[in-house]
Amino acid sequence: MASDPPPPYPGGPSAPLLEDKHGAPRMEEPRPAPYPQAMAFAPPDCGPPPYDANPGYIAPNPGFYPPPGPYVPMGYYPPSPSQFQPPYPSQYSSPGAQGTAVILPPGPTSTSGTTTVTSNTTTVTVLHGEIFQGSPVQTVCQHCQQPITTKISHEIGLMNFLLCCFCCFVGCDLGCCLIPCIINDLKDVTHTCPNCKAVIYTYRRMC
């Protein structure tokens, strides 16, 4: 017993190495990198954005809907109802006549007027003033309000008197100076109503 060697101390030089007991340490093989589940792909290049022809145009809101009803385009204004009303001529109806008389007022620079008389199927148009001359005229009597044709009568006027004086001055005597007094074209003309005998107008050859 005394000749036996002392037991080796754990961890001493005589202790067998862990490598000798279990062998050389095994080298771990490198593991491959995990394959990514999804790879991000960049979108293909489609070129520059499309050109906007109307840079100031704003697209309407898709959630807006115009109210139902008639559509009126911009810049259009419906005409007022007064534009479709036909003009009403000034007309009056005589109490004893069957037709209707329409009177148009005279113009601003003329002293003569216009009278249009319609009786059944007869239309009479009269211009007051110069139209009353040496012949009968169709008109409406201002007194009896009847459409009539005036009755004329010739009367000696100023022109007859002046022509008689002129004939005496040039030597026409023995009654020759009275010749202008028997010429109707030199006399004044009086227009009267054949119904009520009222004087309508007197046409004077010389005022």
UniProtKB/Swiss-Prot annotation:
Where mainly found? membrane
Q: Name one Pfam family in it.
A: zf-LITAF-like
Q: Name one GO molecular function term.
A: zinc ion binding
From the UniProt entry, list the residue stretches annotated as the region Disordered: 1-54
Spell out the GO cellular component terms annotated for this protein, sorted alphabetically and separated by semicolons. cytoplasmic side of late endosome membrane; cytoplasmic side of lysosomal membrane; nucleus
Question: Ranges of Basic and acidic residues compositional bias?
Answer: 18-31
* This protein's UniProt keywords: Apoptosis, Endosome, Lysosome, Membrane, Metal-binding, Zinc
Location(s) in or outside the cell: Late endosome membrane; Lysosome membrane
What domain of life does the native source organism fall in? Eukaryota
Please list the residue ranges annotated as the LITAF domain: 121-205
Instruction: List the biased-composition ranges (Pro residues).
Output: 1-13
Tell me which family the UniProt entry assigns to this protein.
Answer: Belongs to the CDIP1/LITAF family.
**Protein name in UniProt:** Cell death-inducing p53-target protein 1
What is the originating organism of this protein? Xenopus laevis (African clawed frog)
